[in-house]
Amino acid sequence: MYLEQVKTELFEAQDVLNKFISNEQNIKLIQQAALLISDSFKQHGKVLSCGNGGSHCDAMHFAEELTGRYRENRPGYPAIAISDVSHLSCVSNDFGYEHVFSRYVEAVGQKGDVLLGISTSGNSKNVLNAIEAAKAKGMKVIALTGKDGGKMAGLADVEIRVPHFRFADRIQEIHIKVIHILIMLIEFEMAKIRQ
């Protein structure tokens, strides 16, 4: 009944991934982002992550794998997804939804920390505001974007962009792969100081 559609979806996902992998710069940027976060951890910094919708779920998944466990038994790492419901509802009500992430960065972020901002369009106003707040605090910024990078293009210290223009879910599929690789590389890098 839907077998051909299933195959078409899987082949399209594979095509987007292959195009992303074929750009060697993407591979280098993933490594650069992982080292940026690891360097922050080594200096007693932390990573904050944020996004909307599916990207919010990715931001939470990223943080929980770092504080919890990914593939290796190791110490937890200082990662916080900006996802506290009481904070989000308070700031949304009092200041507006476009400030939910930036207010948290202003309150908790410190020089030497890292912000991971995730937006498939690169145009999420609340993530853009968080980037601005992070830069004002002397934090490093990593952005996971899609399409042409939107308004986030050029704002981050490291931008990992999935140049796909059809559906956001295809971009999110690459983002979650990137997130898993970041965590793996962070584990590798942090293991060096435990040896």
Curated annotation (Swiss-Prot):
Q: In which pathway does it act?
A: Carbohydrate biosynthesis; D-glycero-D-manno-heptose 7-phosphate biosynthesis; D-glycero-alpha-D-manno-heptose 7-phosphate and D-glycero-beta-D-manno-heptose 7-phosphate from sedoheptulose 7-phosphate: step 1/1
GO cellular component terms, semicolon-separated: cytoplasm
Cellular localisation: Cytoplasm
- Bound cofactor: record note: Binds 1 zinc ion per subunit.
Q: What is its main location?
A: cytoplasm
What EC number(s) does this enzyme carry? 5.3.1.28
Cofactors needed by this protein, per the record, are: Zn(2+)
**Binding residue positions for Zn(2+):** H61, E65, Q172, H180
Q: What positions does the entry give for substrate binding? A: N52, G53, G54, E65, N93, D94, S119, T120, S121, S124, Q172
Q: Where is the signal peptide?
A: none
Keyword Cytoplasm on entry: yes
Briefly state the protein's biological role: Catalyzes the isomerization of sedoheptulose 7-phosphate in D-glycero-D-manno-heptose 7-phosphate.
Which PANTHER family does the entry mention? PHOSPHOHEPTOSE ISOMERASE, SEDOHEPTULOSE 7-PHOSPHATE ISOMERASE / DNAA INITIATOR-ASSOCIATING FACTOR FOR REPLICATION INITIATION
| UniProt subunit comment | Homotetramer.
**Which protein family is it in?**
Belongs to the SIS family. GmhA subfamily.
Name-wise, this protein is Phosphoheptose isomerase
**Species per Swiss-Prot/TrEMBL record:** Histophilus somni (strain 2336)
